[in-house]
Amino acid sequence: HGGSNAQFDLTGPLGKPGQVAGGTLAFRLTGEYDTSRYWRSFGRERNALIAPALSWHDANTSIDVSYQYVDYTMPFDRGTVLVNGQLDEALRYRRYEEAWSQSSGIQETLRTRIEHRFSDAWRVRATYGWGRDRYDQFITRATAFNSRTGALTRSSDANLGRNDSDQIATLGLLGNVTLAGMQHAIYVGGEYERQRSFRGDTIRGKATTGFNLYDPVYGLLAPGGMANAKQSDSRSVVHAYSTIVQDSVKITDRLTAVGGLRWENWQQESGMGRPFVFADRSRGSVWLPQFGLAYALTPALTAYANVSRSFKPNVASNVAAPLAPEYGRVLEAGLKFSLKPAITGTLAVYQIDKRNVAVTVGDLTSTIGTARSRGIELDVAGQITRHLSVIGSYAYTNANDRDSNTPLVNVARHTGSLFAVYDTAIANLPGRWRFGGGARLVGARSGDTANSFTLPGYVSVDAFAAYETTIGKFPTRFQLNVKNLLDKTYYPSSNSNLIVAVGEPRLVTLTTTVSF
């Protein structure tokens, strides 16, 4: 779409082995700058990334630390609207937002991992992860549309001072021991997680007329406005403390059992307003068991089954009412297989039951009572010949809101993909060639919680060609990628009849990579 991208990746040791605190220290530094014209009516995307990492290890201890910083700006595109209850391909490129509608901010992530081996049987592992996204959103919101005349009512909204963060710390003891003549892989540990979502100034402008989607004139709606005191300073915070015990037991050469128990204590508070008013202050604890069996029917075929329970506090900054935590149960059974020469795959059937599932309509998040997903999944990957490799998947999913007996929004009953890569050399031309391509299938989906319209299914085709050679002393790679090769118009998701996402058109990129 008229853009450019530059990347670098530097990796190497810092000192000789054993010189740094008796161990080996290495670094990696990656960076990227990407800017492009937005593919719809107007707008521009920009991303600047820098990511340093350090790794140190000796005979018994390893330490890994990585950090990533991203400065980004992107159009706040709410997609298209329904015209007489249908999706109109003529509006594929046409936006109803103003040019100032965009989201800009800074994303940061930090990850650390420390592991120490006491013996061949026992080791301890500690991890810490932190992520934060600070951003502002300027939004053109569609509030009503007249399909006959094209008149679109809009408002100028904004969410300023957004600050969403998540941090998680774990500490665990891992052991591989023999007890009662059976091999055990044991894990005992603890976990702490904190999630926080905050929205500062909340601006909700008045709905205004004067814009026609069929003959748009931009610049009639100004950004900004006065913050709504009652809706500003929205905050939701969750603290969760967990203790985990798990054991994988090799009962016989063919039979393996896995059992685990997690106890989680959680605290949640949320509210909004100036002055701040608490809407929810709740706490509780939950036991989450899991159990599984795997049996090797043959060296190439293994049957398995497992059952587990799940728990997740719901965090959102704009809610209709305090959000209760989500509880779930998963039942799964299947077969893992391997075929010659080097093909592996998994066939699984499952049922997932959840209650208090968070759904968002417009910008407002609430929960539905109970949801159930039943399905079949098949994944296959491997080397067909010396030159040809493939990866494919298919899933049948029957997902419903059990209270209303309606399909879940944006969940397709049929999805699948198939991609192949051919790796070869061409006579009289030094280097290697790789050619690949494939397709993704997504079936029809419900477009909103009321099931008032359906998003059509689609097939999207991608392809690439790559050439690897050496120029001078430097390994060099040229790669041409084409996404949505057939330039198919498709709609990946929707939120309402006024917010329907539009898939990107054909995108061609040429990348050159030089290693030194």
PLM features per residue range, with description:
Residues 2-77, 100-120:
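Transmembrane beta-barrel wall of Gram-negative outer-membrane proteins
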Residues 7, 12, 115-129, 133-139, ...:
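Membrane-embedded beta-barrel scaffold of Gram-negative outer-membrane proteins
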Residues 15-25, 59-60, 119-121, 178-186, ...:
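Short loop/turn motifs that connect adjacent beta-strands in outer-membrane beta-barrel proteins
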Residues 51, 55-57, 164, 183-195, ...:
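Structural signature of Gram-negative outer-membrane beta-barrels, strongest in the C-terminal barrel
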Residues 81-94, 145-154, 200-232, 279-281, ...:
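Surface-exposed loop/turn segments flanking beta-strands in extracellular/periplasmic regions
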Residues 110-133, 156-271:
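Face-selective signature of the C-terminal outer-membrane beta-barrel domain
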Residues 162, 186, 331, 409-516:
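Conserved C-terminal beta-signal and adjacent last beta-strands/turns
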Residues 351-353, 366-448:
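Gram-negative outer-membrane beta-barrel transporters
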